[in-house]
């Protein structure tokens, strides 16, 4: 399913089940933080029932965002975000491909280690984001190979990485992460493909 339901019971919210249009398991905490800020700022005038619908329809750009059926981008670009990402990938699904890139000034080796330790994708596809800060794809690929025995493909262009993932996936999901730049580039490429279609 492509949503998360969670509940909270309090004098303010009553016994309410909330639903988020997102599969990121870290999003209920973010939603509750926003709800508490709303309660603090607006008190009884906040209308929690209206916010329930807002949360159900809300989409967080770049946070486990489904950009094509079965294709997700997540801006996870640090260790805590990658940890949250690994906990959000459904363990009961058939298979998936991970597309990854990172910038040079991030702790990408720890991020790669965490991905490889916690996930078992069909394949990792590593690429280079087209920015001076982008880490070399071959370097990232060699780090992945230190931590996993899963197939690792190194493709220099984000477009080639995405097209390869789409061609290889069959009915499997694709998750793209490691950099906000990568998230933006993937979304841009998908927009181009949709415009050209």
Report the location of each language-model feature.
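Short glycine-/acidic-enriched loop or helix-start segments at secondary-structure transitions
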Residues: 82-83, 108-110, 136-137, 185-188
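Glycine/aspartate-rich loop-and-adjacent alpha/beta segment that forms the canonical ThDP
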Residues: 179-197
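C-terminal helical cap/extension that packs against the catalytic core
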Residues: 2-4, 70, 112-173
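Glycine-rich beta-strand-to-loop/alpha-helix junction loops that act as flexible
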Residues: 100-102, 129, 177-180
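Nucleotide phosphate-binding/pyrophosphate-handling subdomain across enzymes
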Residues: 12-123
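Active-site catalytic pocket residues across diverse enzymes, especially alpha/beta-hydrolases
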Residues: 41-42, 89, 119, 144, ...
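Short SAM/SAH-binding signature in class I
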Residues: 33, 169-178, 182
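Extended acidic/charged loop-beta regions that coordinate divalent cations
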Residues: 1-17
